[in-house]
Amino acid sequence: MGARASVLSGGELDKWEKIRLRPGGKKKYQLKHIVWASRELERFAINPGLLETSEGCRQILGQLQPSLKTGSEEIRSLYNTVATLYCVHQKIEVKDTKEALDKIEEEQNKSKKKAQQTAADTGNSSQVSQNYPIVQNLQGQMVHQPISPRTLNAWVKVVEEKAFSPEVIPMFSALAEGATPQDLNTMLNTVGGHQAAMQMLKETINEEAAEWDRLHPVHAGPIAPGQMREPRGSDIAGTTSTLQEQIGWMTNNPPIPVGEIYKRWIILGLNKIVRMYSPTSILDIRQGPKEPFRDYVDRFYKTLRAEQASQDVKNWMTETLLVQNANPDCKTILKALGPAATLEEMMTACQGVGGPGHKARVLAEAMSQVNSVTVMMQKGNFKNQRKTVKCFNCGKEGHIAKNCRAPRKKGCWKCGREGHQMKDCTERQANFLGKIWPSHKGRPGNFLQNRPEPTAPPAESFGFGEETTTPPQKQEPIDKGLYPLTSLRSLFGNDPSSQ
C-alpha cells in the first residue's frame, strides 16, 4: 500500500483530503481512494505509476473517456477519481468531484480550440491522431506500432477467466483504444475457445457492414487525384483494406475513424454475447435468507451490467428492485433508511444481517421481550389471585373463623343444628325448589311433578258401570303437599313466616 499511496506529497495529500466526493456532501477523498484507483488500473492492464504525474493522469483520462458512455459505474468512478487527482497535481483549486470534471472539460475544450487555431495558422487543418498505436515519428510521418503482446495477453486472460461476463466489454474498450481494424482483428483471433460466441460476433459485424454500405453508397465517377476512396463495410472490418489505407483514413482530412467504427460494431456484438452468457434476468436476483447483503449487491449489479437498457432504466431498477428483492430482515432495515439512502449507507446498515451473530442478537431481543411480558403477566395474575376472605362465624370480611374475636356461633354452620360441626354435617344442600338434589326417583325438579293423564269418557255414556275417574278436587291436597315449608328451613334457616 505504501507504494500506491506515494503518488501525492504531504501538501498535495492535504488538498486531496479536503475535496468532497459530492457537492454539498460530508464525505471527502481519502488515501484509500488512490489505492483503489491503482488496483483498478492494474485490472485494466494500465500502468498505475501514471497516477504520480499530471501527464500520466491525462493519458489515463484519454483512455477512459471513450468508455464512459458504455462502461459501468466502476469506470465512471475511476474516471472521476483520476480527474480529481489530475486537478491536485495541476494545483487547480476544486471543492468537489463535479467541479473537477468541469475543470477537465473546460481544459479539453481550450486545447481543442488551440489545436484547431494552430492547424489553421500553419495551413494544415487536419486533426492528426496522436493516440496509440498510430504515432508520429521524428520525420512527422504517421506510423503504426503493432499491438503489444502484453495487451493481447491481458485480453486473452480476461476472456478465459470471465467467459464473456459483463466486465469484458469495458476491458475490451480500454485495451482497444486507438486501435486500427487490423489490431482489433488480431485481438479477436487470439481468442481460442468460445467459437460459438465468435461466430455470433462475426454475424453481427457482417450485419453492421451491410447497413454501412446501405447508408453510404459509392459515388459515381473517378476519384480525384490525391484523394482516398471511401471505405466500404468490409474495409472497416479490415478484410478488404490494407494497414496503410486504414492509417490514411484515420489521419485524413477530414478523418474517417474506421477503428472506432469497427470497435463499436464489436462492442455491439459483445453485448449480444454477454446477454446470451448471462441468461439470468435482473428480476430473478433475490437475496437468500442467510446470504450477506454485500454478496447480494454484487450479484445484483453484475446482472444489471448485462441488461441491455438505458441508464435511466437501470437507475430505476436499482432504486426499486434492490430493496424489493432483499430478504425480510434487510428489507425492514432498508425501508427504515428511506428512498434517499446511498448504497454505502445501505451496506453499512445491513452489515452482518443474516449471519449467526445477527440471528443470535435477534433471538436474544425476542426472548427478552417474551420474558418481560411473562413477568408482567405473572405479577398481574398474582395480584388477581388475592381474594377477600369471609368469616363463617360473624359473617364479616377480612379474617377467617379461626381468628374471629366474636362469640363463637353455636351449632353447625351449614344446617344450624347443634351437636355436630359443619365438616360432620350429613344434611344435604336443598335446591331453590326446596328439594334435596339430586333426586333418585321421580321426575327432575324443573319438570312438572304430577302430570294429569288423559281419561276415558264417563262410564254411564258407554254402559260400563257407575264408577268414574277420581274427581279433580282430590288433587288439591296433593298439590299443596308438593313444596313443604319445612324444606325451606335448610335453605334459608328459620323462616319466621313458617312459625
Curated annotation (Swiss-Prot):
Residues 277-363 are annotated as: Dimerization/Multimerization of capsid protein p24. Residues 73-77 are annotated as: Interaction with membrane phosphatidylinositol 4,5-bisphosphate. Residues 116-128 have a biased composition (Polar residues). The modification Asymmetric dimethylarginine is found at R386, R408. PROSITE patterns: ZF_CCHC (PS50158). Keywords: AIDS, Capsid protein, Host cell membrane, Host cytoplasm, Host endosome, Host membrane, Host nucleus, Host-virus interaction, Lipoprotein, Membrane, Metal-binding, Methylation, Myristate, Phosphoprotein, Repeat, RNA-binding, Viral budding, Viral budding via the host ESCRT complexes, Viral nucleoprotein, Viral release from host cell, Virion, Zinc, Zinc-finger. A zinc finger (CCHC-type) spans 389-406, 410-427. Late-budding domains (L domains) are short sequence motifs essential for viral particle budding. They recruit proteins of the host ESCRT machinery (Endosomal Sorting Complex Required for Transport) or ESCRT-associated proteins. p6-gag contains two L domains: a PTAP/PSAP motif, which interacts with the UEV domain of TSG101 and a LYPX(n)L motif which interacts with PDCD6IP/AIP1. The OYI isolate was taken from the blood of a healthy Gabonese individual. This is Gag polyprotein. The lineage of its organism: Viruses, Riboviria, Pararnavirae, Artverviricota, Revtraviricetes.
